A protein has these predicted regions:
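Rossmann-like dinucleotide-binding cores of NAD(P)H-dependent redox enzymes
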Residues: 1-23, 107, 127-133, 140
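Generic secondary-structure signature for well-ordered alpha-helical cores
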Residues: 3, 7, 11-12, 62, ...
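A general beta-strand register signal
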Residues: 14, 32-33, 134, 170
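Well-ordered beta-strand scaffold positions
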Residues: 18, 36-37, 138, 174
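Short, surface-exposed charged micro-motifs
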Residues: 21, 73, 167
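FAD-site-proximal beta/loop scaffold in flavoenzymes
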Residues: 26-32, 37-113
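Mid-to-C-terminal Rossmann-like scaffold of FAD/NAD(P)H-dependent oxidoreductases
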Residues: 87-186
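C-terminal auxiliary extensions adjacent to catalytic cores
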Residues: 161-220
Length: 221
């Protein structure tokens, strides 16, 4: 769906190849692709994801994984040392798994929790992470853990006539994450379903129906 939007807006996607060489003098003039194609250009952007600099901590004794290991209070393995931000690989008690979140909203929230811990007000970091983006008129949102890992169920709510789709990730009968395109009205509901740990077993056929109201998944009092 995203590729279709890009191509409709005159963005050319080169599939199954990659850049082998950037050429030019003091300024970039273009690139060569591995398939032999030459592309003239004025600018090159390299997107490789996030790399967490932990090399300098390897001799410190602090527990490291992909980032700095922490518990739900953002305490590291060393007493009176806290972590926060992109580097924090913490115990998420909402999703019941280890998480690492690279956005400003989490960095700010984690900074507050770490600061509270430093002044003796030990507080659990409990937040369902989300972020949004947009481009060429499409609205895109991510909430919770959006990875379709082994053992998880992935279901889709597709409405082609509205150019919208929601991919929902389910683990242990609970929704743990979702990716939304042009269906942002459901983001708040999905966030609360994740936070409340609502079980959705037996409701998959209803969930994939784009007309089904997700609010009805909440238990009635």
């Amino acid at each position: 769906m995203i590729e279709n939007t890009l191509e409709k807006n005159n963005v050319t996607i080169k599939r199954q190849t990659e850049v082998s060489e950037v050429f030019g003098g003091e300024e970039v003039a273009g690139v060569f692709l591995k398939n032999g194609e030459k592309l003239d250009c004025d600018m090159v952007f390299a997107m490789i994801g996030v790399v967490y600099p932990t090399e300098w901590l390897k001799q410190s004794g602090i527990s490291l994984g992909r980032g700095i290991i922490a518990n739900e209070f953002l305490e590291t393995s060393i007493s009176d040392v806290w972590t926060a931000g992109d580097i924090a690989e913490y115990n998420d008690t909402v999703l019941n798994e280890t998480m690492q979140c690279g956005n400003w909203m989490n960095s700010r929230g984690q900074g507050e929790i770490a600061a509270l811990g430093m002044v003796g007000k030990r507080t659990e970091y409990k937040m369902v992470t989300f972020q949004t983006s947009h481009g060429f008129g499409d609205l895109i949102g991510f909430v919770g853990d959006t990875r379709p890992a082994l053992g998880r169920t992935v279901v889709y709510r597709v409405a082609p006539e509205k150019n919208s789709i929601v991919r929902i990730i389910i683990s242990e009968e609970k929704i743990i994450g979702a990716t939304l395109i042009n269906r942002m009205a459901e983001m708040g509901t999905i966030t609360k379903l994740i936070k409340d740990g609502v079980k959705v077993s037996g409701m998959l056929e209803s969930i994939i129906n784009p007309e089904f109201d997700l609010k009805t998944l909440f238990p009635t009092v």
